[in-house]
Design a protein with these regions (language model features):
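Non-catalytic, mostly N-terminal accessory regions of nucleic-acid modification and defense proteins
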Residues: 1-148
């Protein structure tokens, strides 16, 4: 199994857990996109990149890692809302963003066990692209299979 396939399977397995709570594939990919953006921004601020983040410190990746339960859920909701008000590309990415993950324990698991365990910037661009494409393909196949 390739690195891309392993990553798609990990992402997909977690998606199935969230689907039990009524989260659609589209919603999952959307939430994953927001969280991955925050995680990759955090990675860019560290060695060997050392870039300055455009995300205000009170809404960065670490603020999500530092919280659990209802505090995590509240922080995530506030982060999405406030980043949507930012100028430039940050505001565009997060405009009208909403939390769709209703279970704070599952949100924490997604953040800590899935997203935070990977160093996303070190992955080849093809791996990230393949993973995203794989999720979209699985989504399309599932929607097509369920449309009967």
């Amino acid at each position: 199994m390739t690195e891309s396939q392993q990553l798609v399977n990990k992402l997909w397995n977690y998606c199935n857990i969230l689907r039990d709570d009524g989260l659609s594939y589209g919603d999952y990919v959307e939430q994953l996109t927001y969280l991955l953006f925050l995680k990759m921004d955090d990675e860019r601020t560290k060695e060997p990149y050392n870039h300055k983040s455009d995300i205000p410190k009170k809404y960065n990746w670490q603020t999500l890692l530092d919280r659990e339960g209802s505090e995590l859920e509240a922080q995530y909701i506030e982060t999405l809302q406030e980043l949507g008000k930012e100028e430039g590309i940050i505001g565009v990415i997060f405009r009208k963003a909403q939390n769709k993950i209703q279970d704070p324990a599952k949100l924490r698991r997604l953040i800590v066990e899935l997203i935070n365990k990977e160093n996303w910037l070190s992955l080849e661009a093809d791996v990230k692209g393949d993973a995203y494409e794989g999720l979209l393909e699985k989504n399309a196949a599932d929607v097509k299979g369920g449309a009967g």
